[in-house]
Amino acid sequence: MASGPSVFLLNVSGQIESAEFPEFDDLYCKYSFVYGHDWAPTSGIEEGISQITSKSQGGKQTLVWNFPVEITFKSTNPYGWPQIVISVYGPDVFGNDVVRGYGAVHLPFTPGRHTRTIPMFVPESSSRLQRFTSWFMGRRPEFTDPKVVAQGEGREVTRVRSQGCVTVSFNVVTKDLKKLGYNTGSSDFPSAQLMPQP
C-alpha cells in the first residue's frame, strides 16, 4: 500500500514589474523571502537585486524593472506561509544610496496569475535633531535587516512614513495541498467564464 504525500509544494514565478515613487528617480530594488520554520526552499533564488531604472517619459512616470522572481518551497503545513519583502533604494542629493521604501506581501494562496500592489514605507527619525543629523551625515534611518518588515515583533514602536508603491505579478502552482486536506478554493469553484451558457 502506497502512502500519501507528506509535503506539499508551492511554486511561484513572476516579476517585480514596476514602482511609483513620484518624488524619486534612478531607483533599484532588492527582494528576499521570509517563511516559517516548516518551510524549505527546494529551488530558485531566495534573494536578488535589480538593475537601476529611470522614470518613463510620459504622463504616469512609472519606474519599470520587470525583474524576474522564481522559487519553489516545500512544507508540511501552511503556518508561516512565505512572504516577499521588497526594499527600494536610490540616491539622495549627495549621491548616497538611501532607502526609499520597504514593503512585504504574502505569496498568493491560490493557483493562477495574481498581481499585487505593495504600499511602501520608510522609517523616520523620532526628533527634528535626529532628522537633521541623519540628513547632514547622509545616513537615513533604515532597518539593519529588511526582513523585519514581514514580522510583527517590535514594529508597533517604529515611526514610519508611507512613500510609493511597487507592483508585483505572481504565477502560482501548488502540488498536493488538496491531498493533505488543505482547500484553497480554486478548483472547487469553476470560473463563471468557463461555465456553459444555458
Curated annotation (Swiss-Prot):
This is B9 domain-containing protein 1. InterPro entries: C2_B9-type_dom (IPR010796). It comes from the Eukaryota. PROSITE patterns: C2_B9 (PS51381). Component of the tectonic-like complex, a complex localized at the transition zone of primary cilia and acting as a barrier that prevents diffusion of transmembrane proteins between the cilia and plasma membranes. Required for ciliogenesis and sonic hedgehog/SHH signaling. It comes from Xenopus laevis (African clawed frog). Its main location: cytoplasm. Pfam families: B9-C2. Keywords: Cell projection, Cilium biogenesis/degradation, Cytoplasm, Cytoskeleton. Residues 8-126 form the C2 B9-type domain. Part of the tectonic-like complex (also named B9 complex).
